[in-house]
Amino acid sequence: MGFKYIQKIPTPAQILQEMPMSANLKKTKVSRDKEILNVLKGKDKRLLLIIGPCSADNEDALCEYVSGLSALQSKVKDRLILIPRIYTNKPRTTGQGYKGMLHQPNASEGPNISQGIIAIRRMHL
């Protein structure tokens, strides 16, 4: 049994090279990771809230949503740490229908996993 390649998928190294995190974003991530770890270890009394849409399938809407969470985070930072949950697939029992951004970044076009990986990376930056 063999596989037929429909399209080549970029490697993680290629994606990271083409779409690296900025120095400022890296610094923010390290700081947030430390805050989260301190909550999990009981060293920080704030609550973690992991929140987000059931499924992220619109890049612009998701970026607007996360920007709103960021504004809210600044208001509740003494009590809460808000963590956006960004789930980019849509579970399907039968395997039929729209499967989410990973498989089909534009719901009105055909599947394109390569473009889906890029769209998801963009959203997570």
Q: PLM features: what roles do these ranges have?
A:
Residues 7, 21-28, 57, 61, ...:
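Catalytic cores of large soluble enzymes that bind and process phosphate-bearing ligands
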